[in-house]
Amino acid sequence: MATPVDAMPIEIDQGELQTRYLELGDMAIRHARVPAGSDMSPLLQGLPDDRCQSPHWGIILEGSIHIAHADGSVETTRTGEVYHWPAGHTATTDESVVFIEVGPVEQMRQFNEHVRQVFAAAD
C-alpha cells in the first residue's frame, strides 16, 4: 500500500505546525512540519514524565531539531540524517524542520490522542 504524503490524514493543523498521521499495520507514520522556535514540551504535558513515550525512526527532510532525552542528553538531528529517538524525549527547534517518522502504533497513537485533547482544550 502506498499513500502520497499529502493524502495522509491531518493530525495537527495549528498555523505553521502541521502533522499528518497514518497507521499501517503495527506501525504508524507521521509527516511533520514544525516552525522555528517551537518547544514541544507544552504539548507533552500530561503524558508520563511529560515526554513522548514512543520510539521513533525517521529522516529529517529539511532543517534541524533538538531532542532532549530523559537522561538529560540533547542531540541535534539535521537535514539528510536518519535517526532513532527512544521513548522519553521532547523536542525544540531553532529553525523550521520537516521530517518523517515511523513508530509503533500503540505509542504513536498515545501522542496522537493526547495532542488532540490539548488543542481541543485550548479552543
Predicted regions span which residues?
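Short, conserved beta-strand element in jelly-roll/cupin
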Residues: 50-67
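Short acidic-glycine-tyrosine-enriched beta hairpin
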Residues: 69-88
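Short, surface-exposed charged micro-motifs
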Residues: 20, 57, 90
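A short, sequence-level motif marking secondary-structure junctions
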Residues: 35-38, 80-84, 106
